[in-house]
């Protein structure tokens, strides 16, 4: 233990506020260090001076006056009319401490309300915007353009151009996100999104013309490669066994 | 009968009362039930401690009187909350410290008073060498009291309360921590800091100027 450490501990050492182990180490150091021993002596003298911090001798009259005032106050309080107590009770809510507590509680409540309001308000439009953007993307995917290997679907009965999808449900609903493996090893590589569309009456390309009035299920999967798109059409009555089985793949 | 005997024990010194908890508990019970005579006895046996601590905290008699009055009013008001297993005088000290803090905050007068006292101490410290020969011991003692009062005035409020309770009232550190509603470590740190400052103050104003060393 060096002098610097001892100097830090001396104020507690002289007041016997140190643990035994530390006190023994300080005492050992003081025996060998005159400078620290002198400092310890000064602390002791300062402590002796502190004992002189005495108030003047208060007279008995002073004490009596204090007691009398206290007893008078107690007497006055005990005879306070009930109306004053009621006034005190009414006045209590306006005391500073109470007012602070109420203000803090109100501030917290308003903050929480504002947080939830803003959170809900911002999430709604965001979700709508996301849905619309998804819808637009799918629309783009569905629309025939350029060299895209899109299926040519029969148009509507009223003679629209074949190839145009007669109707896309207003809100395309993503059913699942699958992993399409393009590698032999089967490593999942390309996320494929699938969407389901309900088309209205279709005709022409279907081998069975009697099914033109049936609803066609279109299942479209977009791979990460924009040139590769997998679209499945399903006619419920194409397969006699199960209506859910796919009938055509493009 | 027992209560009458108790009320006749007015001349018992305070340290004897602290040992006789049963007698004090009896007075407290009676005071809680509204017996003002019993409460007056409690005041008589604790007034010196309260006044002295108030004076040491606030630095003047007028404030100490006001503080004592407020302390006893609070003691009477909250006596019902006092637990019998507690040390009554530690509880009173706690109230006293709180009241003195409130008064110091409200009035802010004690700082100026201590400051003026500090000036006096500084002036008198220069005169100490002249008093060495044929010194009047009482006068030197008075100067030393002023010096230590000036040193106490330099301390922050919390350090002053901690060192008053620990070094002057002689309470254990844990008890001081309980009264000040603080931890023992914090109190030890405050006490250490206060002792350093007092020593430095003494060095500056007394020892290095060739003043008296006790």
Which residues does each predicted region cover?
Chain B
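Short, charged helix-capping/linker segments at alpha-helix termini
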Residues: 32-41, 51-70, 208, 213-214
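C-terminal edge and immediately downstream basic/flexible tail or linker adjoining helix-turn-helix-like DNA-binding
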Residues: 2-20, 112-122, 126, 141, ...
């Amino acid at each position: 233990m060096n002098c610097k450490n001892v100097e830090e501990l001396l104020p507690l050492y002289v007041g016997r506020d140190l643990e035994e182990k530390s006190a023994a180490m300080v005492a050992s150091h003081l025996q060998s260090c005159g400078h620290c021993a002198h400092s310890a002596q000064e602390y002791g003298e300062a402590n002796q001076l502190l004992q002189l911090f005495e108030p003047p001798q208060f007279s008995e009259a002073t004490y009596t006056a204090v007691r009398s005032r206290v007893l008078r106050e107690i007497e006055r309080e005990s005879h306070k009319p009930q109306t004053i107590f009621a006034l005190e009770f009414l006045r209590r809510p306006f005391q500073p401490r109470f007012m602070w507590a109420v203000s803090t509680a109100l501030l917290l409540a308003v903050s929480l309300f504002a947080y939830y309001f803003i959170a809900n308000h911002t999430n709604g439009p965001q979700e709508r915007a996301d849905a619309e953007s998804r819808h637009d993307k799918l629309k783009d995917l569905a629309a025939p353009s350029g060299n895209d290997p899109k299926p040519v679907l029969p148009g509507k009965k009223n003679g629209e151009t074949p190839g145009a999808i007669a109707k896309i449900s207003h809100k395309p609903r993503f059913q699942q996100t699958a992993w399409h493996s393009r590698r032999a090893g089967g490593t999942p590589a390309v996320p494929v999104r699938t969407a389901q569309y309900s088309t209205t009456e279709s005709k022409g390309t279907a081998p069975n013309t009697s099914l033109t009035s049936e609803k066609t299920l279109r299942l479209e999967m977009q791979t990460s490669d924009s040139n590769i798109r997998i679209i499945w059409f399903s006619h419920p009555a194409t397969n006699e066994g199960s209506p859910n089985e796919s009938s055509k793949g493009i | 009968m027992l209560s009458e005997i108790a009320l006749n024990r007015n001349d018992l010194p305070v340290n004897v009362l602290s040992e006789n908890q049963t007698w004090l508990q009896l007075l407290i019970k009676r005071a809680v039930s509204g017996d003002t005579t019993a409460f007056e006895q409690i005041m008589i046996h604790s007034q010196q401690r309260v006044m002295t601590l108030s004076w040491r905290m606030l630095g003047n008699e007028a404030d100490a009187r006001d503080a004592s009055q407020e302390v006893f009013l609070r003691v009477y008001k909250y006596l019902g909350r006092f637990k019998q297993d507690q040390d009554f005088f530690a509880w009173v000290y706690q109230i006293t410290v709180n009241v003195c803090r409130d008064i110091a905050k409200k009035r802010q007068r004690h700082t100026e008073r201590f400051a003026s006292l500090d000036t006096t101490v500084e002036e008198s410290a220069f005169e100490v060498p002249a008093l060495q020969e044929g010194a009047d011991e009482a006068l030197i003692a008075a100067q030393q009291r002023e010096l230590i009062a000036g040193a106490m005035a330099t301390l922050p409020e919390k350090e002053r309360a901690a060192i008053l309770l620990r070094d002057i009232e002689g309470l254990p550190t844990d008890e001081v921590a309980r009264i000040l509603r603080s931890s023992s470590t914090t109190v030890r740190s405050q006490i250490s800091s206060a002792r350093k400052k007092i020593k430095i103050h003494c060095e500056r104003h007394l020892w290095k100027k060739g003043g008296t060393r006790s």
